[in-house]
């Protein structure tokens, strides 16, 4: 766990999350708050790694996340991040594709919709937010 306030890489940020290797089974108000805070932090980290969002009229909604700096640290750590992303989206695993050669994760259709709605729920200053709102309102992209 890092002690300074400004992690320098995505791997450092993810290291601060202390991602468990299994899903926690304990319950309680404080535990739920901690999990929600870590989930928000995890989504914020991944939102800075979004590579592209496809136009949904061209064959479905897709979102690509670049995990190169995480996977260069450890492929096992990358697998753990992908596992937690799958738990976060809680969708059909067939909608999440991992490209091990480029170290990217592609979310399709429902998985992309769930992830992007989590990203943009609290982050109106994200560079892709205007595209998301145009698509969500049914207007053409700028």
From Swiss-Prot:
It comes from the Viruses. Pfam families: DUF5844. InterPro entries: DUF5844. Belongs to the IIV-6 115R family. This is Uncharacterized protein 031R. It comes from Invertebrate iridescent virus 3.
């Amino acid at each position: 766990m890092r002690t300074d306030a400004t992690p320098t890489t995505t791997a450092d940020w993810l290291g601060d999350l202390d991602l468990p290797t299994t899903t926690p089974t304990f319950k309680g108000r404080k535990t739920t708050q901690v999990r929600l805070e870590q989930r928000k932090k995890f989504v914020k980290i991944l939102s800075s790694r979004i590579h592209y969002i496809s136009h949904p009229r061209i064959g479905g909604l897709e979102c690509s996340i670049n995990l190169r700096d995480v996977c260069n640290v450890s492929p096992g750590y990358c697998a753990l991040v992908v596992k937690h992303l799958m738990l976060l989206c809680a969708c059909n695993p067939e909608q999440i594709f991992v490209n091990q050669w480029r170290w990217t994760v592609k979310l399709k259709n429902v998985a992309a919709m769930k992830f992007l709605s989590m990203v943009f729920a609290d982050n109106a200053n994200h560079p892709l937010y205007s595209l998301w709102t145009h698509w969500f309102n049914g207007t053409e992209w700028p």
